[in-house]
């Protein structure tokens, strides 16, 4: 008779593209997000939590030629009902909320949201399928005063979490100005618009690569094209030389003062009404920020900001950290972008058919946290709990009473709940928990009404570097009356703070 096959055990591993977060990583992120939330609250924004699951229809992500949603989202179908998906950002749920509750929400509606999002994309080094976003948006405010406020709030948030002035810059541009440049370059003429739309798309993508490719690389893409790093030929926009000069002029229009920059942009947009409106909006944003005390050392008009210009409809902004760090190759590089946003006035239109003005910003949580770690500004790991050890199994209630006394005094504490047979294992456990103190009481100490207090941090320091005389003068373990337990532990914790 054949033996029944054993049921294979499941593999204890995270799915590809996902990871787990422990202790310090979680507390560091929470501390940073709490500080950002305080700033958003200070600026009058309210928190919003939406479901992690949305209908694919609400997210707006699907392939037009098949029944299955886009690979970019994690999606499934329940029987014959709608396709559902995990949210891929925090903006699409906001669009649904703004439309669904438009008769109940105040207008403008100011909200912030923080939480995980999911992308069904190929993972890579530092690129995961689940990550955190931190957004703030104003829906229903057509004035660029809302854009200026978001920029000011972003700068305030960066400083609140520990990024010093001089270590960051918020740069502001406007899609309308770029449209004006395209119009002055003859790319938006109605007679040739259909033919030029492809060229405009190539031009936007080319300008978006300015930081990486430089002037010559972008010029080649605006012209006939160029070979990329793999050797493949990338088709260009095939623009005339004067058109290329006009668009390159936009990407390099930043001057020594904001007034000179705005004058240069005015020249580049020519007679374009939309372009001139964009320049005027930038001037208005600059004036509003100046009135609040935000000068060009913190927030600056900079036409070289091009990320997102294919998506946003008006002002666009990006926060860049300017201090230097070592990259994976040991090279010294500027840290770079940690947040971006802008105006997108088509947010709710897909649901209601009516254009609703909106503007907002999204902070890259993981990147900003990495920056704080690089600067030594991330919240230091909180000490572990005080460990009350178990010397006598039949006195568990007494030990638990000690734990309760410590907790009543606001001291993080726990009772060792493993096998108490080997006392050395209890101290190993305390070390693994980063415990600052171990409390020890055997039957002899109990009879005398005392406890042994072991300063684990000092003990480690003495073991590592102290001489014999120093070891004798600074004992890491003291005997104190039970009544002094809380006071002695508090004193040790205060020394280590």
From Swiss-Prot:
| Keyword Protein biosynthesis attributed | yes
Compartments annotated for it: namely: Cytoplasm
UniProt GO MF annotations: ATP binding; histidine-tRNA ligase activity
Q: Which UniProt keywords apply?
A: Aminoacyl-tRNA synthetase, ATP-binding, Cytoplasm, Ligase, Nucleotide-binding, Protein biosynthesis
Please cite one Gene Ontology biological process associated with this protein. Answer: histidyl-tRNA aminoacylation
Quote the Pfam families the UniProt record gives.
HGTP_anticodon, tRNA-synt_His
Q: Which InterPro entries match?
A: aa-tRNA-synth_II, aa-tRNA-synth_II/BPL/LPL, Anticodon-bd, Anticodon-bd_dom_sf, His-tRNA-ligase, HisRS-like_core, HisRS/HisZ, HisRS_anticodon
The reaction(s) annotated as catalysed by this protein in its Swiss-Prot or TrEMBL entry are:
tRNA(His) + L-histidine + ATP = L-histidyl-tRNA(His) + AMP + diphosphate + H(+)
Task: Name the Enzyme Commission number(s) assigned to this protein.
Answer: 6.1.1.21
Q: Main localization of the protein?
A: cytoplasm
Cellular component (GO) terms are:
cytoplasm
Could you describe the subunit structure of this protein? Homodimer.
User: NCBIfam families annotated for this entry?
Assistant: hisS (TIGR00442)
**What family name appears in the similarity comment?**
Belongs to the class-II aminoacyl-tRNA synthetase family.
* Stated name of the protein: Histidine--tRNA ligase
- Lineage of this protein's species? Bacteria, Pseudomonadati, Pseudomonadota, Alphaproteobacteria, Rhodobacterales
